[in-house]
Amino acid sequence: AAEMADSMGIDIFNTSLGYTRFSNDTGGVDELTSWTWDDLDGNTSYITRGADMAAQKGILVVNSAGNSGSNSWKYIGMPADGDSVLAIGATDSSRWRSGFSSFGRGSDARVKPNVMAQGSYVYVSGLDSNGNSMVGFNFGTSFSSPLTAGAAACLWQANPDLTAWELKSIIEESSTQFNYPDTIHGYGIPDFGKAYELATQ
């Protein structure tokens, strides 16, 4: 998909992919095919390498951090571990980290998740059990990621001369914890007003 996106001239690629642990036939964890803590190095998995390659070609790759924060795995998945991937964690409407939002690895220089966006109590449209249109709430970093990708697209429209890497850096620099990132919130919540100023100065 990333190769096709590149061939079509896509500038921003948003995904909710997150590969971590796989089940065996009995419902347990298949240790042979599952990823380990050591594999979260940003270089091991093919999906992460592919996402980083897309970023190297000038695509802003935005990926949900994952919803494993409250289970036994608890860390981001692949390709969110890529150093060129903008991994997005989830907050609630009060700007508190959502309990399900996955944690970063924290054992090297990569800040993961990179930033946070609302992923709890997100208004979404859909169908009810009778097939009628409805609006309701939903949860997940799969909602945080496209919110960030959409805002990034607006920034890029404001200054089309930015590179994907510059845009990623501006989003991080505008965030609430830029000077003290951690493995829970990354650089924090972006201030897209501030990001706009940085993008257009």
Label each residue range with its predicted role.
Residues 1-81, 107-110, 129-145, 183-184:
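Substrate-binding/access-modulating region of protease and related hydrolase catalytic domains
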Residues 3, 7, 49-56, 86, ...:
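Solvent-exposed, polar/charged alpha-helical surfaces in well-ordered, non-transmembrane soluble domains
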Residues 10-14, 157-201:
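C-terminal subdomain of the subtilisin-like protease fold in secreted/lumenal serine endopeptidases
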Residues 18-23, 67-71, 91-95, 106-107, ...:
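Solvent-exposed loop/turn segments at secondary-structure junctions
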Residues 23-25, 73, 121, 149, ...:
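Active-site-proximal flexible loops/turns
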Residues 46, 52-53, 95-101, 190-193:
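N-terminal domain-start motif of subtilase-like serine proteases
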Residues 80-157, 161:
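Extracellular S/T/G-rich loop segment that most often corresponds to the catalytic His/Ser-adjacent loop
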